[in-house]
A protein has these predicted regions:
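Conserved N-terminal catalytic core of the sugar/cofactor nucleotidyltransferase
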Residues: 2-5, 13-16, 26-27, 31-106, ...
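Active-site glycine-centered loops adjacent to acidic/histidine catalytic or metal-binding residues
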Residues: 9, 108, 136
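Hydrophobic packing residues within well-ordered alpha-helices of enzyme cores
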Residues: 14, 61-65, 184, 233, ...
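A structural signal for short hydrophobic beta-strand segments in well-ordered beta-sheet cores
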Residues: 25, 146-148
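Catalytic-core segments of class I nucleotidyltransferases/pyrophosphorylases
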Residues: 103, 117, 121-124, 153-252, ...
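Conserved donor-nucleotide/metal-binding helix-loop-beta segment in metal-dependent transferases, i.e.
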Residues: 113-141
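Charged/polar low-complexity intrinsically disordered segments, enriched in acidic residues
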Residues: 252-258
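Short, amphipathic C-terminal "tail helix"
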Residues: 260-261, 266-287
Length: 287
């Protein structure tokens, strides 16, 4: 399975912070926001990754992430000049995807919790249909809302309904089979002129091929798209890391523990981080 990180948009809700920098490059406590979505793909075992962003922001992402080989990954890059919908990612990435199944994750979504790596690895084994997650929220009318039966089969999905049929929202991570590009190309723009991810999911739903996996109460899902939620996400990460003494969404550590890089390669990475606490933490992994 291949992975796509969608890190486009103008981040208008975060102005003036995002007037000169991509939202997904802003810090969430001690690391760039993009590290959190990247880490989810890595935990799923996905090593070939396409990052899609604006022409203005791509150079900064390239400088930060490089070709991915330092983490045992392979990065590609593509432009989305204007925000024309999440589902456009599959059209932009058609050549990258080829005939492989694909996971799309939004660059401003942060996940953490018990059992999450196993759920991601299981989802990455998908060969037919599509799989989305369901997360209970108190304000489902703000999200794409999904209804499903006890077997995890989707029954209905709506985008920001006035009267939600459930309190389960669909977070910004989606798994699709190799037919996703063809289906995305058949989508019609919505009233706001975008190719909607909910409409793509509806195509799989209509074919009886949309599965739902619940994220349990032990999983946190944070959307760092506003000043308030960005601060909350940073405070959450700091609290967990200070309490546990372990980092959340550290690509170097994940690459090492997943066997993508060895101890010699990890030690080489620590030299570029100087005397920062981040670098000191990585050195403890080699002790």
């Amino acid at each position: 399975m291949k992975g796509i990180i969608l890190a486009g948009g103008k981040g208008t809700r975060l102005h003036p912070l995002t007037l000169t920098i991509s939202k997904q490059l802003l810090p969430v406590y001690n690391k760039p926001m993009i590290y959190y979505s990247l880490s989810m793909l890595m935990l799923a075992g996905i090593r070939e990754i396409l990052l899609i962003s604006t022409p203005e922001d791509l150079p900064a992402f390239r400088k930060l992430l490089r070709d991915g080989s330092q983490w045992g990954l392979k990065f590609s890059y593509a432009e989305q000049a204007e925000p024309r919908g999440l589902a456009e990612a599959f059209i932009i990435g058609a050549e990258f995807i080829g005939q492989e199944p694909t996971c799309l994750i939004l660059g401003d979504n942060i996940f953490f919790g018990h059992g999450l790596p196993e759920k991601l690895r299981n989802a990455a084994n998908l060969t037919e249909g599509a799989l989305v997650f369901a997360y209970p929220v108190k304000d489902p009318e703000r999200y794409g809302v999904i209804e499903f039966d006890e077997t995890g089969k989707a029954l209905n999905i709506e985008e920001k309904p006035r009267q939600p049929g459930s309190n389960f929202a669909v977070p910004g991570i989606y798994f699709y089979d190799r037919t996703v590009v063809a289906r995305a190309k058949n989508l019609e723009p919505s009233g706001r002129g975008e190719l909607e991810i909910t409409d793509l999911n509806r195509l799989y739903l209509a074919a009886g091929q949309l599965q739902v996996e619940q994220m349990g109460r032990g999983v946190a899902w944070l959307d760092a798209g506003t000043h308030e939620s960005l601060m909350q996400a940073s405070s959450f990460v700091q609290a967990v890391e200070d309490r546990q003494g372990m980092m959340i969404s550290c690509p170097e550590e994940i690459a090492f523990r997943m066997g993508f890089i060895n101890a010699v390669e990890l030690e080489k990475l620590t030299t570029t981080l100087g005397t920062s606490n981040y670098g000191k933490y990585l050195r403890t992994l080699l002790a």
